[in-house]
């Protein structure tokens, strides 16, 4: 035991034994993320976050449990709530996250896997899905985030030249009339795909997953491509491979704005 692990659950410490822990800084987002060199013979990841409503790991744990056997996602190895913190130990998927330089070097291959991966996520049957993260819920959460001052006003000012309250008001005024509901990843960007060679290994960071408008993912995917490559040169290819005709640009802008609160 050392200073960083002294408050961890005893059961977790016993499970980990003397294995090597390394802080992980890309993918598997969370307050504290560790790469576990070996857990019962295989590598794993440990996520730790406060149990407060806007940072709890509970939604991700529920998503991973529901997706087990439906999509390639990490298997849950251990969970706990202890001392005001959530703990999630899960298997490590083989490969590298989509932002890794060796993956990004093969741009067209990445875009292909990126689009096909999203198509597989959105192809899940949602009729009995217990996870909901649609627009009304997102707006309620955004309102609470604004009211509790959980978003940096400077970031909103820099990007949109307004206050968080004004941006939230704009979202209410311009809310899309309809939702095209699918199972959505919720934070579909390059670091949240794991790619092994030339194949998609799986999806990570599913804390925002649930039934939502497909544009929740499409919008962030387009933004991620723009961020990675500096422009929209791969946007048309991504949409073609995903299988979308007639992009709703207003919805793209809307969901990118909404994501400022998350």
Curated annotation (Swiss-Prot):
It is found in: Cytoplasm. One of its GO terms (molecular function) is kanamycin kinase activity. The active site is at 187 (proton acceptor). GO terms for cellular component: cytoplasm. InterPro entries: AGP_Transferase, Aminoglycoside_PTrfase, Kan/Strep_kinase, Kinase-like_dom_sf. Keywords: Antibiotic resistance, ATP-binding, Cytoplasm, Kinase, Nucleotide-binding, Transferase. It comes from the Bacteria. SUPFAM superfamilies: Protein kinase-like (PK-like). CDD domains: APH. One of its GO terms (biological process) is response to antibiotic. Pfam families: APH (PF01636). Its EC number is 2.7.1.95. It catalyses: kanamycin A + ATP = kanamycin 3'-phosphate + ADP + H(+). Monomer. Resistance to butirosin and structurally-related aminoglycosides, including kanamycin and amikacin. Belongs to the aminoglycoside phosphotransferase family. This is Aminoglycoside 3'-phosphotransferase. The lineage of its organism: Bacteria, Bacillati, Bacillota, Bacilli, Bacillales.
């Amino acid at each position: 035991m050392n200073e960083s692990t002294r408050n961890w659950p005893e059961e977790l410490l016993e499970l980990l034994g003397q294995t090597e822990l390394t802080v992980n800084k890309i993918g598997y987002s969370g307050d504290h993320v560790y790469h576990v060199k070996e857990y019962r013979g295989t590598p794993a990841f440990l996520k730790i976050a406060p149990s407060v409503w806007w940072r709890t790991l509970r939604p991700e744990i529920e998503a991973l449990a529901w997706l087990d056997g439906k999509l390639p996602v990490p298997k849950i190895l251990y969970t706990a709530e202890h001392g005001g913190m959530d703990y999630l130990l899960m298997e490590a998927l083989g490969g590298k996250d989509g932002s890794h330089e060796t993956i990004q070097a093969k741009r067209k291959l990445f875009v292909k896997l990126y689009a096909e991966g999203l198509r597989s996520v959105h192809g899940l049957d949602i009729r009995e899905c217990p996870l909901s993260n649609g627009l009304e819920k997102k707006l309620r959460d955004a309102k609470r985030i604004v009211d509790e001052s959980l978003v940096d006003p400077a970031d909103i000012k820099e990007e949109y030249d307004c206050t968080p309250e004004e941006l939230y008001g704009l979202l209410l005024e311009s809310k899309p009339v309809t939702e095209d509901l699918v199972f959505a990843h919720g934070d579909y960007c390059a670091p949240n795909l794991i790619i092994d060679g030339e194949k998609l290994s799986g999806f990570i960071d599913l804390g925002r997953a649930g039934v939502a408008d497909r544009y929740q993912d499409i919008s962030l995917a387009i933004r991620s491509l723009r961020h990675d490559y500096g422009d929209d040169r791969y946007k048309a290819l991504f949409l073609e491979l995903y299988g979308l005709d007639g992009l709703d640009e207003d919805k793209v802008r809307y969901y990118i704005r909404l994501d400022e609160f998350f």
